[in-house]
Amino acid sequence: MDSENFKQHLKKLYSVNNGKVKITNEIVKFTQNHSEPLHQVQKDLINYTNTNFESNSYMLTDGNQNQFFTLLLKVLNAKKAIDVGVYTGLSSLSFALSMPDDGKVTSIDCVRDYEECCHLHWKKANVDHKINLVIDNAKNHLQKLIDNGESGTFDFIFIDADKDSYDAYYELSLKLIRKGGIIAFDNILFFGATLVDHDSKKPEDQIFLGCPSFQRMVDALKLLNEKIANDERVIKTMLPLSDGITLVTKK
């Protein structure tokens, strides 16, 4: 091998996007196809959601995320998990499929709109007995778990719900997660909006600045991002996977 030519070639490659792969839909599909395959019922649930709840299907947990969580829960040997923000049940399904038969997922949502869809697919995958669907205010139920003596007993907690409450969920989850367990926050980049300043004049940023209710959620996420980044109680990492995920474990 011509080592000098090889080095020059690498320099040229590095000069394009600083040597990083630009994440396109083609790249995402490639990585999904070369990761642990989704269970057939996961695929069925994705299709069912896209067909029957098209207007809200953007709330589905990303396929790459589900593959990532499958591996993560296996590494953790997880037997107890909490899913805050259930929607049509895909994330809870993924967690239950990754657990042994005596594993338990506490799935919390504040609406019953998708309850039938959840149970339909959980039963189809033979994991319905592992999942306890709780229709309640998530902050209230997390506190109930603490009051019932379950602090420090959960292996994995996934937060994908109302962004205004993320900070409250964080503090409650820190009490519930065991040492060595992981708390995961979804949508931490929020379409890229958490990188945009309020006073930005860039044309491409204006789409993020025209809706007060959206901006309120963005502000809550920005505060949480800074809080976690500077929180000495935890070890943390933020990943640009899908809409952004932050993983946290207690020191």
Curated annotation (Swiss-Prot):
<dbReference type="GO" id="GO:0032259">
    <property type="term" value="P:methylation"/>
</dbReference>
<feature type="binding site">
    <location>
        <position position="186"/>
    </location>
    <ligand>
        <name>a divalent metal cation</name>
    </ligand>
</feature>
<feature type="binding site">
    <location>
        <position position="91"/>
    </location>
    <ligand>
        <name>S-adenosyl-L-methionine</name>
    </ligand>
</feature>
<dbReference type="InterPro" id="IPR050362">
    <property type="entry name" value="Cation-dep_OMT"/>
</dbReference>
<feature type="binding site">
    <location>
        <position position="109"/>
    </location>
    <ligand>
        <name>S-adenosyl-L-methionine</name>
    </ligand>
</feature>
<feature type="binding site">
    <location>
        <position position="162"/>
    </location>
    <ligand>
        <name>S-adenosyl-L-methionine</name>
    </ligand>
</feature>
<dbReference type="GO" id="GO:0042409">
    <property type="term" value="F:caffeoyl-CoA O-methyltransferase activity"/>
</dbReference>
<feature type="binding site">
    <location>
        <begin position="85"/>
        <end position="86"/>
    </location>
    <ligand>
        <name>S-adenosyl-L-methionine</name>
    </ligand>
</feature>
<comment type="similarity">
    <text>Belongs to the class I-like SAM-binding methyltransferase superfamily. Cation-dependent O-methyltransferase family. CCoAMT subfamily.</text>
</comment>
<dbReference type="InterPro" id="IPR029063">
    <property type="entry name" value="SAM-dependent_MTases_sf"/>
</dbReference>
<protein>
    <recommendedName>
        <fullName>Probable caffeoyl-CoA O-methyltransferase 3</fullName>
        <ecNumber>2.1.1.104</ecNumber>
    </recommendedName>
</protein>
<keyword id="KW-0808">Transferase</keyword>
<feature type="binding site">
    <location>
        <position position="83"/>
    </location>
    <ligand>
        <name>S-adenosyl-L-methionine</name>
    </ligand>
</feature>
<dbReference type="GO" id="GO:0046872">
    <property type="term" value="F:metal ion binding"/>
</dbReference>
<feature type="binding site">
    <location>
        <position position="61"/>
    </location>
    <ligand>
        <name>S-adenosyl-L-methionine</name>
    </ligand>
</feature>
<dbReference type="GO" id="GO:0008757">
    <property type="term" value="F:S-adenosylmethionine-dependent methyltransferase activity"/>
</dbReference>
<keyword id="KW-0489">Methyltransferase</keyword>
<feature type="binding site">
    <location>
        <position position="138"/>
    </location>
    <ligand>
        <name>S-adenosyl-L-methionine</name>
    </ligand>
</feature>
<keyword id="KW-0479">Metal-binding</keyword>
<feature type="binding site">
    <location>
        <position position="160"/>
    </location>
    <ligand>
        <name>a divalent metal cation</name>
    </ligand>
</feature>
<feature type="binding site">
    <location>
        <position position="187"/>
    </location>
    <ligand>
        <name>a divalent metal cation</name>
    </ligand>
</feature>
<dbReference type="InterPro" id="IPR002935">
    <property type="entry name" value="SAM_O-MeTrfase"/>
</dbReference>
<dbReference type="Pfam" id="PF01596">
    <property type="entry name" value="Methyltransf_3"/>
</dbReference>
<keyword id="KW-0949">S-adenosyl-L-methionine</keyword>
